Amino acid sequence: MEYFNLFIKSVFVDNMIFAYFLGMCSYLAVSKTVKTSAGLGLAVTFVLVVTVPVNYLINKYLLLPGALSWISPKLSSVDLSFLTYILFIAIIAAIVQILEMVIETFTPSLYSALGIFLPLIAVNCAILGCSLFMQERNFSNVGEAAVFGLGSGIGWLLAIVAIAAIREKLRYSKVPKGLQGVGISFIITGLMGIAFMAFMGIKI
């Protein structure tokens, strides 16, 4: 039940887009069609499911003050927390590179549709932000970190697919010239963010 609560909270209450507005660059740039948005959302979800648990282990057994005591008691005073950003980003970049090669090999059409935004997942602030949130919340085990990564990824996927579906409908609507494109997308994102705030009233 604890894992389920964490998952629901990660998807709806602490949604990376609607609660923290992380990953907005690719969210706005790629969300022109549902198909492409779903592909990028699944890619982001995969990266989060892999990187958050891996970064949890790195944080627990390498970065935290005294984390190296499992190697030798003499290393209990070593603090490598200053390497957090470097190592987290390195892990994310490595996973994204592997994912990029897999997508290019098996689904070239999706690879072409995503374009530059696929390798840019490595610097997507939602990916790094999720690992930093994991570190801040002091999860008790790697399972919680994995569930948090999965929930955050699905929440991001839900957000980008929702905005893409709305933007597809907007093509047939009379949007004022000054709001066409990114302008109306920002307004819709804000309205959906307000709607998602309703989930904050749910005690989980």
Segment roles from a protein language model:
Residues 22-36, 96-110, 163-174:
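C-terminal ends of transmembrane helices
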Residues 5-18, 78-92, 147-159:
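Structural signature of hydrophobic alpha-helical transmembrane segments
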Residues 21-29, 100-106, 117-118, 125-139:
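Generic transmembrane alpha-helix signature in multi-pass membrane proteins
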Residues 22, 26, 44, 49-50, ...:
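Hydrophobic core segments of alpha-helical transmembrane domains in multi-pass membrane transport
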Residues 36-46, 86-88, 110-121, 176-184:
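Cytoplasmic-side transmembrane-helix entry/capping segments in multi-pass membrane proteins
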Residues 1-4, 60-82, 131-146, 201-203:
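Helix-coil boundary and interhelical linker segments in multi-pass alpha-helical membrane proteins
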Residues 60-114:
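Ordered, amphipathic secondary-structure segments that act as subunit-interaction surfaces
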Residues 5, 140-204:
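C-terminal transmembrane helix-loop-helix hairpin of multi-pass membrane proteins
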